[in-house]
């Protein structure tokens, strides 16, 4: 049985496996342009591919499958598992890019509804408290060892709302730490990785009716030549 990357109502319009596979194809097409920069910035040219494989991992949660998408945003668990599974400093950047790849939506869900301008850790904890964060579907594609490790951990012990909130607190401390110049460099690295992830994600979502903004479609055409 395939997992689902995109529901319309209760109908699955794109499988998880198809979406990730197509997004990884875009990632490989972009590697000649961004690979050397990623190697220098993150210590690995695979940073974008890792972000692609983690970015929708949260869609495998029972909360997402059940349709509880008003209080549960899938980016949150994808970022959590990237931060907790990856072993190098790159995990902070991959997790941040994953958390922000639908930034307007996550802000609307966790900040806008409460009249806030930013997402607070306490809000994140409260919003996730009643969501079923257990693994609801195991994808059927040849995923990376890091993703396999995350899925094993998830199946054996689902994270709690406190686990996720604590991880985001750790992420925020890392990204905001250091001298002002160091913090700016960190933000630029996140922005660069997020840009590539967004292009790959939109390429992976091609064919979905009405999906993507003008800007995201333009990026896909201009950078991938399609």
UniProtKB/Swiss-Prot annotation:
NCBIfam families: cas3_HD. GO terms for biological process: defense response to virus. It comes from the Archaea. Belongs to the CRISPR-associated nuclease Cas3-HD family. Mg(2+) binds at residues 56, 74, 101-102. Its EC number is 3.1.-.-. Transmembrane segments: none annotated. GO terms for molecular function: metal ion binding; nuclease activity. Proteins of this family have an N-terminal nuclease domain and a C-terminal helicase/ATPase domain. In some CRISPR/Cas systems the domains are swapped, in others they are encoded separately. Monomer. Can form a Cascade complex with Csa5, Cas7, Cas5a, Cas3 and Cas8a2. Induction: Repressed by 5 J/m2 ultraviolet light and 50 mM NaCl, slightly induced by 20 J/m2 ultraviolet light, 100 and 150 mM Nacl. Member of the csa5-cas7-cas5a-cas3-cas3'-cas8a2 operon. CRISPR (clustered regularly interspaced short palindromic repeat), is an adaptive immune system that provides protection against mobile genetic elements (viruses, transposable elements and conjugative plasmids). CRISPR clusters contain sequences complementary to antecedent mobile elements and target invading nucleic acids. CRISPR clusters are transcribed and processed into CRISPR RNA (crRNA). Cas3 plus Cascade participate in CRISPR interference, the third stage of CRISPR immunity. Acts as a ssDNA and ssRNA nuclease, probably with both exo- and endonuclease activities. This is CRISPR-associated endonuclease Cas3-HD. InterPro entries: CRISPR-assoc_Cas3_HD, CRISPR-assoc_Cas3_HD_sf. Keywords: Antiviral defense, Hydrolase, Magnesium, Metal-binding, Nuclease. The keyword Hydrolase applies. Its cofactor is Mg(2+). Residues 9-204 form the HD Cas3-type domain. It comes from Thermoproteus tenax (strain ATCC 35583 / DSM 2078 / JCM 9277 / NBRC 100435 / Kra 1).
